[in-house]
């Protein structure tokens, strides 16, 4: 195996974010994508306390009794956002396949803003843009997860600017494409 494929390149985003080396960072990302197709990022500006708070409160939520967690299950099986108990969901179901469920319990959330009005004319979009079910009673899962989600949104926007710079197009080229993501 070629030596260059034995490790993934780690790229520091900090010089892009602070403006000291935007072209150099973009070039590193382009090279990683061309040569390997994957990369690791650091210097992404997501605070460790934001990650730790979300992890801690998530563990607290998943340790709750099943009856309390079930209060945050979506009202219809086809909706994703909210809590899903162990072995109640599976990727195969979305593909129309009959197979055993995934052996996991999950909590799923989407964008904080309500984008549904932009997609009312698409019946399938109602499921993707259903409101978040954010626990705040037994455990305030909402606040730390919203903080983390917003950090991920900011990181996504930064990465798309890096990609745009690497492709030699305007830094905002991809921005409008993620305004109403789900």
Say what each PLM segment does.
Residues 1-182:
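Peripheral, non-catalytic segments flanking oxidoreductase cores
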């Amino acid at each position: 195996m070629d030596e260059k494929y034995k490790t993934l390149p780690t790229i520091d985003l900090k010089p892009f974010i602070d403006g000291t080396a935007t072209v150099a960072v973009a070039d590193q990302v382009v090279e990683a994508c061309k040569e390997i197709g994957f990369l690791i990022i650091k210097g992404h500006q997501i605070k460790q306390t934001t990650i730790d708070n979300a992890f801690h409160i998530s563990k607290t939520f998943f340790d709750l009794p099943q009856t309390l967690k079930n209060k945050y299950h979506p009202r219809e099986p086809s909706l994703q956002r909210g809590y899903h108990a162990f072995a109640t969901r599976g990727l195969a179901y979305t593909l129309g396949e009959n197979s055993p469920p995934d052996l996991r319990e999950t909590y799923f959330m989407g964008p904080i803003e309500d984008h549904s009005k932009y997609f009312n004319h698409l019946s399938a979009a109602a499921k993707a843009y259903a409101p978040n079910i954010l626990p705040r009673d037994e455990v305030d899962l909402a606040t730390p997860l919203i903080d983390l989600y917003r950090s991920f949104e900011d990181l996504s926007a930064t990465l798309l600017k890096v990609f745009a710079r690497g492709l030699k197009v305007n830094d905002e080229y991809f921005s409008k494409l993620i305004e109403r993501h789900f």
